[in-house]
Amino acid sequence: SPYNKDNTLVAIGYTYRALDGRPIWGSDGAVYIKKFPIDNYYLYEFQEAINEATYIVAHNAKFDLAWLREVGIECNNKVIDTMINEYVLNKGIRSKLSLDALSEKYKVIRKQSLLGDALSKGLNYSDMSEEDQKKYLYYDVMSTAEVFEKQQKRFKRSENKSLIPIRDLMCEFCS
């Protein structure tokens, strides 16, 4: 949590994706990762990427948005939370909503257990090697993007189209 004075933001990762076949700027499949402390130029560059986005996709978005606000990033975009998406698609029936569980369910790229391995050794994310941090963040970003794409396909099914306004309303509360 950014509200705990002992916690610090150590990295930001993001990618650009096209939605419904419409290309977007920078849609090159790359994952952009920057470790903290971040210079003002990178914050400006990241803010520009946020400003150009049609919307932001995140898993457990309230966590990410709190950190972005803490470092001065304004996010006035529509936010779509893959955790909320899944809750809505399951029509409120309890299920596992972690990114790892959804990655397994949708058979998409999964985060590696790099963070889990570090935590089991009493380390924090910031204690991991830069290479391991980048790997973890890459898989986190790509897992979220791929889960989102699978969820979008489910929302397009006739039996789920009525759920879209509910999803939008719930996601609006988190942004």
Predicted regions and their residues:
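Conserved RNase H-like, two-metal-ion catalytic cores of nucleic-acid enzymes
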Residues: 1-98
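Short alpha-helical "patches" and their helix-cap loops
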Residues: 28-38, 103, 157-168
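Exposed alpha-helical structural elements
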Residues: 41-45, 98-102, 114, 132, ...
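Generic, well-ordered alpha-helical scaffold segments in large soluble proteins
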Residues: 49-53, 67, 71, 82, ...
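Short helix/loop capping segments that flank catalytic or ligand/cofactor-binding pockets
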Residues: 66-67, 97, 111-113, 146
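Mixed-charge, glycine-rich, non-catalytic linkers/tails in nucleic-acid processing enzymes
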Residues: 74-77, 119-175
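Residue-level detector of short coil/turn "hinge" positions at structural boundaries
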Residues: 75, 110-111
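Short alpha-helix plus adjacent loop in nuclease-associated cores
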Residues: 79-109, 117-128, 132-133, 137, ...
